[in-house]
Amino acid sequence: VGSEMCIRDRSLILYAEHGFNVSTFTARTITSSLSDIHGAITGAIASLKGPLHGGANEEVMHMMNKIKSPNNALKWINNALDKKEVVMGFGHRVYKSGDSRVPTMRKYFAKVAKIKKDKKFEKIYEIVQKVMIERKNIHPNVDYPTGPTYHLMGFDTDFFTPIFVISRITGWSAHVIEQLASNKLIRPLAAYNGSKQTKIKWLNVLLTKLHKSFLLLEIA
């Protein structure tokens, strides 16, 4: 149990802070308006709710449960790629040749698997990873080893993202403090790339309907 607690704590350290990701940028943007830390953290959590940012380690575990057995892994991953399905736990917006956090978390995954005497998920892990690198040249991110590690430690899959939040609050809070120290309102510019002239054909129809509605109200 002591070893598992240590591994859990180190996984929280790996998740605690990771630059200007979506949730961190959200927290800093909210802070720049001089909203309070409660609003900043709430906004960060809301952005983490999106499956493209948070929840990836949950999806990894759902995938491994679908595969069920190492014997099914090769066929499953090849079918998924043939169907152009998204395989969660792989790829990163910054790391193109591998997430630097993965080797550490992979080591902890192996330790937990040894403690639990369960090698099934490790075998699935290796098969899926091998195919993803060979066929797509896409490497795993930290969510890939974290999902099965948390599962083997006894956490319900639905708790993986809340655990992420518990960890990342540290990083968000640090960014809020840093933003306030030399604050300027964050106001990105947007470049319009729509058509230069647009005819609004439905405007006259809408105005006619509104006019009729007002007439009916007057009659009533």
Feature map (PLM): residue ranges:
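Short, small-residue-biased leader/transition segments that mark boundaries at the very start
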Residues: 1-7
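Short, hydrophobic/aliphatic alpha-helical segments
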Residues: 11, 20-47, 77-78, 126-152
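Conserved phosphate/anionic-ligand binding catalytic regions in large, soluble enzymes, centered on
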Residues: 34-61, 87-96, 139-175
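Cytochrome P450
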Residues: 50, 66-70
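Short acidic alpha-helical/loop segments enriched in Asp/Glu that coordinate divalent cations
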Residues: 57-62, 73-77, 120
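A structural-propensity feature for long, helix-poor, extended segments
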Residues: 72-108, 197-208
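Acidic, carboxylate-rich catalytic segments that either coordinate divalent cations
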Residues: 84, 115-220
